[in-house]
Amino acid sequence: MNRAKVLSSYLGLLRTEKKVFQNDKRALEHVINLTRVQFRDNKNETDNTKINEMIDHANAVSHFLVKDLIQGVRKDEKTIQLKFDENTKSYQQYEFVNDQPPQRKKRGKIQIDDEQPTTCCGGGCGKPMPSNNSEKSTCS
């Protein structure tokens, strides 16, 4: 019974991958190879609970690929066309306009007031400035 479930989930996942990645040969080869390796690595598993968890995981991956995956195809340097399927969960057309970050604006020159600071060092200690230059500042 478990063998039939495992084979069914394996073949179903391979069919889903072929359907979803039909136009992306490199991605298709990668996911099929990854699926084969993972199923082959776990072929000697005898624990029924682990086998059922792995079957559920394979079915969840298959469901994710059909319902949630959206592929993008680069049309030119700034345009990517998203490929939606009729099975995709949120089939909406989005148009990204001005998705580049805005250009930084140049600031003008910083103006510094010619006033003398009213505190001793101008640094915010709050102590008054000494009346003549011979006195030392009490700031630490």
Curated annotation (Swiss-Prot):
Biased composition (Polar residues): 130-140
GO (cellular component) term, any one: mitochondrial matrix
Organism listed in the record: Dictyostelium discoideum
Keyword vocabulary terms for this entry: Chaperone, Mitochondrion
Protein name from the UniProt record: Complex III assembly factor LYRM7
A Pfam entry, by short name: Complex1_LYR
Compartments (UniProt record): Mitochondrion matrix
Disordered, as annotated region: 93-140
Superkingdom of the source species: Eukaryota
Record has GTP-binding as a keyword: no
Known partners and oligomeric status: Interacts with UQCRFS1.
Protein family: Belongs to the complex I LYR family.
Gene Ontology terms describing biological process: mitochondrial respiratory chain complex III assembly
One GO molecular-function entry: protein folding chaperone
Signal peptide (from-to): none
Role according to the record: Assembly factor required for Rieske Fe-S protein UQCRFS1 incorporation into the cytochrome b-c1 (CIII) complex. Functions as a chaperone, binding to this subunit within the mitochondrial matrix and stabilizing it prior to its translocation and insertion into the late CIII dimeric intermediate within the mitochondrial inner membrane.
InterPro entries to which the protein is assigned, alphabetical: Complex1_LYR_dom (IPR008011), Complex1_LYR_LYRM7 (IPR045298), MZM1/LYRM7 (IPR050435)
